[in-house]
Amino acid sequence: MGHQHRLLDDENRRILKEDYWSKLDSTVKLVYFNSEDPTCQYCGLVKQILEEISDPELTDKLEIIEYNFERDIDLRKKLGVLKAPATLIQGKNKGLIKYYGVPAGTEFPAFLETIVHVSTGDVHLPDEIIEEVEGLENPVNIKVFVTTSCPYCPRMVHTSYMFAMLNRRIEAEAWELSGFPDVASQYGVYAVPKVVVNEKVEWEGAVPPEYLMRKIREALE
């Protein structure tokens, strides 16, 4: 890690290894879009977080693949990456799972939990919802706007990510807004979590999977 201070102390590393990475099954790719833009104030921090959590001493199941937002334009467009820093979690998920910004604060354990799900393929949703999500035949984009201090945000992010686990037509995005004031104003985010489905249906507040499903149907009408 060179000269920079470690973000995770020994105790946190132990918790990470025992409580999270011990559950990993298949390899997970963390696809990270860095940027050379000096305004990308959190790009270096996100890279450090990803490097520390995928330390080979903790697990051999995580692989970081770094791309450049400005140079890797074709891939960026193919994956629909709109800003940097962005991290895509790739494993047993069928749809795209993206995290924009810094996975810190209340979002950090949820980010780790997502990596575990993507590694094992486990989906925590009621059976009838799983069937409905798997049956969706049109593209669905779910944006969940969050902050690192919001207690209810991780649950909403988790639900949207579980939907993306199940269907290749779904992309679920968490937007941690501290680095994206322009995005916050573009979407009129005043309270978090705020959810926007297909740029069409939106609401504030964490909701159960049944409600999210209903809103997706509404957005597809």
Tell what function each PLM region has:
Residues 153-221:
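Structured core of small recognition/catalytic domains
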Residues 35, 59-72, 168-184:
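Thiol-based oxidoreductase modules, predominantly thioredoxin-like and allied folds used
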Residues 73-91, 97, 186-198:
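Structural micro-motif
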Residues 1-6, 22, 38, 212-221:
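Iron-sulfur (Fe-S) cluster-binding modules
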Residues 11-58, 133-168:
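Local sequence-structure signature of Cys/Sec-based thiol-disulfide redox active-site neighborhoods
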Residues 89-122, 196-221:
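Non-catalytic, surface beta->alpha helical segment in thiol-disulfide oxidoreductase systems
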Residues 2-29, 109-137:
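N-terminal leader/targeting and pre-domain segments
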Residues 11-12, 22-23, 45-54, 58-61, ...:
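Acidic, two-metal ion nucleic-acid-processing modules in DNA metabolism proteins
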